[in-house]
Amino acid sequence: MVKMVSFRSKVWCGVEKGCRHLPIVLNATLVFSITAEVSYLVLMEAPLEPAQKESEWSAHWKTMHLLAQYFMLGSIAWNASLFLKTSPSIRGVFFNGDIVGQGWRYCYTCETHTPPRCSHCYDCNVCVLRRDHHCVFFGQCVGFRNYRYFLNCLLFMWAGLLYAVVMNAEVFIVILKEGVTFHSFMLLMVPWIMLVTGQVTAQAFTFAFIADTCVVGFLLVSAFLFFHVGLMLRGQTTREWYSARRPYNLGVLANVRECLGEHWYICWLCPLIPSDLPGDGINFKVTGSLDPMK
């Protein structure tokens, strides 16, 4: 009986880990699919017919496009990797019991006192320093130590998707070359149905699906990026935004430095640029009331 319970618990843990990594696999698949499709558009200058093109791209122009594209892809992958490797939790952090004061709480799950802005994540099953939210796309919490990589990843995803949308303008031109018809509308809105019913080829479906994904992804990432940039400029976390609290607003420049580190003005160019955070994730300067009602 004990062996059966142990086996079930191991299976459940495996399923749980698989579910946690599934969003990462799906996101990586989408990113590389978009990159491959845009590379094809750059190299083959498809799907426009030669008669529809005003001019052909030179080899140097194509090379510049590909270099810019793979720079953005590399930045996304590197920031995402460092985000996942950088634990935002309290594991390995020593809390001095003498400094427990206003804003501190006791976590009964972790069985320890936790500092202000720290909260327990039931998905990660641990308390997270300056916890912002649990990112379902990466399967990990966004907190004090990895916020920089999260924000930079959003920035390069936004730039990459904007570039992909512009490059996929050719796809929309081809689909809408005869105007907004029932066929073109269905191909853009529900390309899966058009493929299953045999109304379009696999190639047309692929171009339409990825073009749609680029537009939808760009809108979603734009919303996330602008929201989190706004939070950073106000010195807030998502949880503090929900409760309309701004007790840690130190001014725009200081708020940016708190999130991105001392070299905030250049660290966004490359995740390998060192940029030490000015705080420790435990003690924060307070400029307002910690009471959410004030």
Which stretches of residues belong to each language-model region?
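Membrane-associated feature with strongest affinity for ZDHHC
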Residues: 1-294
